[in-house]
Every structure is written in C-alpha cells, then in structure tokens.
Amino acid sequence: MNPGYRGRFAPSPTGPLHFGSLVGALASWLDARAHGGTWLVRIEDLDGPRTVPGAADDILATLAHFGMTPDEPPIWQSTRDAAYTAALERLVAAGLVYPCGCTRKEIADSLRAAHERHTTLAYPGTCRTGLHGKPARAWRLRVPDGNDAVVTFDDRWQHAQSQNLATEVGDFVLKRADGQWAYQLAVVVDDADAGITHVVRGADLLDSTARQIYLQRCLGVPTPAYLHVPVVVDANGEKLSKQTGATALERDDPLPALRAAAAHLGLAADGDRPVHTIDAFYAAATDAWARRFGPRAG
C-alpha cells in the first residue's frame, strides 16, 4: 500500500447504484489500486428529502458484490455537522463569509436582468454590504475580484482548466436557506479531514472544482489532484442518473457491467483474451489504467 495516496467514491443515497455511478466508482477504485493507495467510500446523505431509506446500505452491498470494498469504514456526511459548523465559524471569524437574505426569486430576477443587459450571470453580491433589512437566509463565501478571482488547475483527464469565480459564479452558498450544508463546503471539509489526496469523479462536477480549490485555500487545507471522467449519457444526451430513469445494476453477474464501464473509460480491460473472473478483470483493468494514469510499475 502507498500511505501517501488516499482516494474516495462519494455516492448520494437517492436510489440504487446504476451504471453511471459504477463508472465513477470503478475509475476511483482503479486509480487507488494503480497507485497502491487507500480507497474510501463517503455517503453524501446531507440532502434529507432526497435520501432514500436503505439506499446507502444497498449501494455498499452492490459495491461489495462488484468486488469494491472500502479500505476503511464508510464516512457518512449526516454525522459531520460539527465539522462543517467549525469550518463555517473559521470563515466567519476571518471575514470571508456573510449572511445572505436573497430569495430564489430575487436572485432569478437579478440574473434575468443581467442576461438582458448582456452582463455577468453570476450572483451579483446583493448582500455583500449588509442584509438591507432582510432576514438572513443563507451564508455565502466572498470571492475575490480581478485576477485573484481566476482559479486554474490541471485535471489529469480534462487537462488545463480555468474559471473566473467573480464573473462565472459569484459569491457562493456554504449553508443553504433551509439550514442544510451546501455541497461545496461539505466536500472540501470531508476531503480535508479524510486526508484525500486524489479525487476521481464525473466530469459533471468539473465546474465545481474551482470553487472547491478556492475554499480549500480559504480554510488552509491541501488541494487534491483531480481527475474528471466522462459521464454516461442516455439516448437524449442527458447524464444518466436516477432522475433520468437509470436502472439498478444487476448483482448476479457483475462482469458485463464492469467490462462496459471499463470500455466507457477507454480501457481494454480484457487485453488479448477475455477474462472470466472479477479478480482477473480488476488485475487487467488496473494495469490498463496505470498505463494511462500511472504509476503501477514496480
């Protein structure tokens, strides 16, 4: 094992594991194994209304049937309120966040007006200077202006990336109006506390990465290496998800789905001859992954 490498797969328990999720799980698992590292599973169950009872246990059981068992006990976001609160308090003390009283309608109206004026569609910073008599609803992280707003990073699959937080995003929410923690804060705190060094996930989250890197800088925590794999889409070109009718994986015969997931990732996991066991598949797939993303040699 390489104690310096720590990766993770972070599903939301909104339903059973489907093929699109399998691609993400497989990519993160292969990267961890190719590097001789530790692979974790984090259950992202913060969104109470969307969480399906029993779905998390079903996801973990399906992963086990497919030969992917985490190296440490799963992490549950729903148990980590104190960690998120402590992070927000640090940002408040540093003057980096502010309460926001804007409703969704007010923000939508501002963005619509900006669109009509052909100006930025980012959150306009209405509450930066105060609530103006409105009750506090959410907490936002203040993003910098000018050149300091540009976050660049090199993605291991998607290559050079750049985003101007001021013009493309605006001050973003860390705690929502309904009291729930926002995805960006929870992910950054969880990755830091778990010592995650490598994040492998779907390209639908590529747009979130610059925000997470900026938040990591604000909290003074390390930035992992990022790799965003192509997402699986349905016949209409929509991301395959539970919301678009993705069906649960068949546990009885994992190999066909694993081969299809490897093919989606551009891996010739069978090599010159077909493999007939899960162990043989993973050995071949890990070698194929390492040839692209290293460093299994030795």
Curated annotation (Swiss-Prot):
Binding site for L-glutamate: R8, F9, A10, P11, S12, E44, Y183, R201
Keyword Translocase: no
GO biological process terms on file: glutamyl-tRNA aminoacylation; tRNA modification
Cofactor descriptive note: Binds 1 zinc ion per subunit.
Motif ('HIGH' region): 11-21
Alphabetized UniProt keyword annotations: Aminoacyl-tRNA synthetase, ATP-binding, Ligase, Metal-binding, Nucleotide-binding, Zinc
GO cellular component, one term: cytosol
Keyword Metal-binding: yes
Cofactor(s) the protein needs: Zn(2+)
GO MF annotations in UniProt: ATP binding; glutamate-tRNA ligase activity; zinc ion binding
EC number annotated for this UniProt entry: 6.1.1.-
Binding site for Zn(2+): C100, C102, Y123, C127
Highest taxon listed in the record's lineage: Bacteria
Residue ranges of the motif 'KMSKS' region: 239-243
InterPro entries to which the protein is assigned, alphabetical: Glu-Q_tRNA(Asp)_Synthase (IPR022380), Glu/Gln-tRNA-synth (IPR000924), Glu/Gln-tRNA-synth_Ib_cat-dom (IPR020058), GluQ/Sye (IPR049940), Rossmann-like_a/b/a_fold (IPR014729)
Binding-site residues, ATP: K242
Entry-linked NCBIfam families: PRK05710.1-2, PRK05710.1-3, PRK05710.1-4, queuosine_YadB
Function text: Catalyzes the tRNA-independent activation of glutamate in presence of ATP and the subsequent transfer of glutamate onto a tRNA(Asp). Glutamate is transferred on the 2-amino-5-(4,5-dihydroxy-2-cyclopenten-1-yl) moiety of the queuosine in the wobble position of the QUC anticodon.
Similarity annotation: Belongs to the class-I aminoacyl-tRNA synthetase family. GluQ subfamily.
Protein name: Glutamyl-Q tRNA(Asp) synthetase
Taxonomic lineage of the native organism: Bacteria, Pseudomonadati, Pseudomonadota, Betaproteobacteria, Burkholderiales
Gene this chain is encoded by: gluQ
